[in-house]
Amino acid sequence: MSIDFRNLNTLWGSILVETLARLGLKIGVVSPGSRSTPLTIALARHPQIEAIPILDERSAAFFALGLAKQLYQPVVLVCTSGTATANFYPAVIEAKESHVPLLILTADRPPELRHAHAGQTIDQVKLYGNYPNWQAEISCPSANIERLRYLRQTIIHAWWRCLDPVPGVVHLNLPFRDPLAPTPDLEINNLEANFDQEAFFSHISRQNIAINHSILQINSLPSKGIIIAGLASPQNPESYCQAIADLARSQQYPILAEALSPLRNYAGLNPHLITTYDLLLRNPALRTQLTPDVVLQIGELPTSKELRTWLEEIDCPRWIIDPHPDNYDPLQGKTGHLRVNIEQLGDLFPDKTDNNREYRQLWQKFDQQARLTIDRLLAAETKLIEGKIPWLLSQYLPPRTPIFISNSMPVRYAEFFNPPSDRQIRPYFNRGANGIDGNLSTAIGIAYKNVPSLLLTGDLALLHDTNGFLIKKYFVGSLTIILINNKGGGIFQMLPIAKFDPPFEEFFATPQNIDFCQLCRTYGIDYHLISDWTDFEQKIAVLPESGIRLLEISCDRAFNTQWFLSNYV
């Protein structure tokens, strides 16, 4: 793209955006506003960058988060000055906690208009606290080549800080003086005449710097161990699953795989898979019988409270394998961290194919028995209950479907009931901060220009983010929303507070009594109320090629809780 020399602000904006384009930026998400005009114009006119306007900043930020999860590279997020910037905050927190690269560009008033009650002006410097990987304020635009070089190099640094050493958020605050519109300014003509665009950008590379990992050398592991594969959304799920399968085979260890890990969807790669660990560990005798001598934990711990409590009880040595510098041990156990990708583990652990196979086979025997019980129970259930939904999704969804699983009960039912399969379903999630805000917008971002995708969510999580439906105007792709409508917060029904009503129903369950058919009509969303399981199976077996569709499953919250407590716990 040619640099825009119409005035100082268009020059500044186009240098910034051209630098990002050469670094590999594909998409910019823009919320409307006046102060951000130079950034908006530069993004909108660049032929290699897709600029998407999203009205609501909070929704825009989660949409960008979803895009970045799908693309595995930074997405730019732009807004005007003032409180608009604060609406990015929830997504900033989630991006930081889940290591998603976002480059946030907040426009601002120039310094002389701050602290003087100028309109739409707040203190935006370091607005997001300690959540960004890096943050800085760019100087006001200036028409000299040294300042343009400064801008270019700062943007290059910001891009790589989004990715290295850990993916996350970078915040740049950019003040602009008037005129914000691209009105001509003849004073910068001399700079244009002496500007060599190709020479100016020639050194920019899309190749990241190499990262060196300090790896602890381990001579041997105990023969009686387990691998715990926590939530993960790797760019190449097959190689990720293969690396864990190779480790399991070399050590003869069973793998306890979370539903938010791709392992359950690549079961053919791994005959050592255990998926019913939550149910098995509710049995006091098995908790003792299945105690290992060592645990290899891949990434974060699974959601299961039973598993976490058991690990606290046994307190055996645990190696946490993950490249990020975070502490992934909320249990404060006997842990050591190996800061390396599982795919790079190689021969760190010597082959122990003669290890204690009886221990691994014991896990597999109990897992097969528990799986048979769960499958029979769910297959026989004709009433619409929440737990059967993820169980059927894992069997009927088209292969390789991306599925965003909302927080609260959907992630837990997936962990409890999802069977292993070879359908290569790709799970996505916002488990960095585990909130229910922004789930719809994130799912739309994941589905954008992707294969037909799916969102599994509860009613309260969906209602938290109905502004996400405004993205429909610009949405390209297919998203099917599975709405579990239990008229309130189902997770609270499982807690002791449920026995105290009042105030339980009004202040904890908080039913909203929304007509979702009417809500969908408002936004032009295709709606269908599921009548029975056959209807549901037919609707999810073939996903639409385009558009947004909502399938509502109405569940009785009290009955569902009673079913779970009677049949599972």
UniProtKB/Swiss-Prot annotation:
Cofactor comment: Binds 1 thiamine pyrophosphate per subunit.
Classification via InterPro entries: MenaQ_synth_MenD, MenD_middle, THDP-binding, Thiamin_PyroP_enz_TPP-bd_dom
Main enzyme class: transferase
Keyword Transferase: yes
Cofactor(s) essential for the protein: Mg(2+); Mn(2+); thiamine diphosphate
EC number: 2.2.1.9
Family under the similarity heading: Belongs to the TPP enzyme family. MenD subfamily.
HAMAP family named in the record: MenD
Function: Catalyzes the thiamine diphosphate-dependent decarboxylation of 2-oxoglutarate and the subsequent addition of the resulting succinic semialdehyde-thiamine pyrophosphate anion to isochorismate to yield 2-succinyl-5-enolpyruvyl-6-hydroxy-3-cyclohexene-1-carboxylate (SEPHCHC).
Subunit structure: Homodimer.
Protein name according to UniProt: 2-succinyl-5-enolpyruvyl-6-hydroxy-3-cyclohexene-1-carboxylate synthase
UniProt organism field: Microcystis aeruginosa (strain NIES-843 / IAM M-2473)
Gene: menD
